[in-house]
Amino acid sequence: MGGDIHLCSMILGKNHLIFLYFANLFGSTLSFLATIITIVFYLVKKYIQNKSFRENPHQYCHQHQYFDSSKLNEINNSGVGSYSSTPISIQNNNNKNNNLPKQKNNEKQPLINKNHNNYCNYSTSATSSSSSSSSFSSTNSGSSYEYQQPQKNQQTLSSSDKNNTIPSTNTKYEIELSIPQFKGNKCGPNCLLFSNIPQIKNALEQKKNPKKIDTLIFYLSISDFIAVSGIIIEQLIIIFNKEISKSIGFCIGERVSIHFGLLATLFWSNCIAYYLLRETYELKPYNIRFVYFHIVCWGMALIGVASLFFSKIITVSNIDQGGSWCSVSSSYQLYFWVIPLFVSFTWNLICYCLIYRKFNKIIGIYGIQSVQIKTIIIRKLSFYLLAFLITWVWDVINNSIFLYEGKCPPFALWILQEFFSSGYGFFNSLAYAVTTRFYSRK
């Protein structure tokens, strides 16, 4: 059976088209509002994080790595005579995310401390093989940090309350840390050290950026917004101005905008599934370059809609005495919508099963009482992938019936497809809101 599958819904529901319009418009309106909220929330959150980083950069060091200065005596008493290019490992018992980028060549691992509510003054000095010098200072909540880069060839690590020092040989980066007293009290066991080591700068820049999954959802929301905006405009024009809806220019314009947004939505959903799968099996955040995702998602969507400008791809079909529908050729619909939809649905289903299997093994080893495991399961397993599967399963069923049985699907399935497929942005935003709420409880 050839032709546009949507003509089936128009023919079957010619006496009840109001239900199709209402289901489609209702789902699109929910998605439109939800995607706007998601996009605005993401941008505001990113702005606040960037502003907070500019004003108080040390708070991101607090989240990055901590230094227990109670280990200082152990280092000094261990008889270490020089601080060579091999760093001294200082463990922290209070932080589970104590992971810095691996060192290269002769770069020493910096010591970064967390200090809560302490009015402390920190001073650091570092030198490199060159004769250049620089300075850095930051002030926040009564705490001041000062960074200088004089010309030195030796490094010492000292504490104001104990004359413990560690001499250093010539290395690429040489750091001096002094921990003074304040108001008769010691500064405390956790103190922050700023340095000019490139790994730390890169880590701090990454720390102030939103989570990668949030960024992926942001771009998914943009593609949803493009699609639902086209759907809403189309429905309103069909209802209030039927003359415009009969023109071929209108058909091409609204089909391009809707199809571009829907294709981009499928590809961004595939990228999210890929990211969650990699992060789950590696048990750590997966470092990605978003430029590749942009090329795949937006590029493939552009290729998909480019052929719509060729002749005989889109035609205006007359429905029931004066009504019209912008019909797409069956071959185009098969290759540029049905096949990508089936592939995306299968890929997301495979990722769902693999992640579910992985977490079943983890729960079997560590027990289901682990709060962290429960949170990860809720976040990664139950929302983003399920949102995709639930919303697009009706489209898959209807296209399967249309292609393999050669007949129009039941009208009730069309109602479900019109609502869920146009409401995909709403369910994505709902998943984003729920996971963000769980983040705040962690």
UniProtKB/Swiss-Prot annotation:
Segments on the Extracellular side according to the record's topology features: 1-16, 241-255, 311-334, 404-410
Alphabetical list of Gene3D superfamilies matching this protein: Rhodopsin 7-helix transmembrane proteins
Transmembrane segments: 17-37, 220-240, 256-276, 290-310, 335-355, 383-403, 411-431
Protein keywords: G-protein coupled receptor, Membrane, Receptor, Transducer, Transmembrane, Transmembrane helix
Protein known as: Cyclic AMP receptor-like protein B
GO BP: adenylate cyclase-activating G protein-coupled receptor signaling pathway
The encoding gene: crlB
One MF term in the entry's GO annotations: G protein-coupled receptor activity
Region (Disordered): 83-166
General function of this protein: Receptor for cAMP.
Feature: compositional bias, Low complexity: 91-103, 123-144
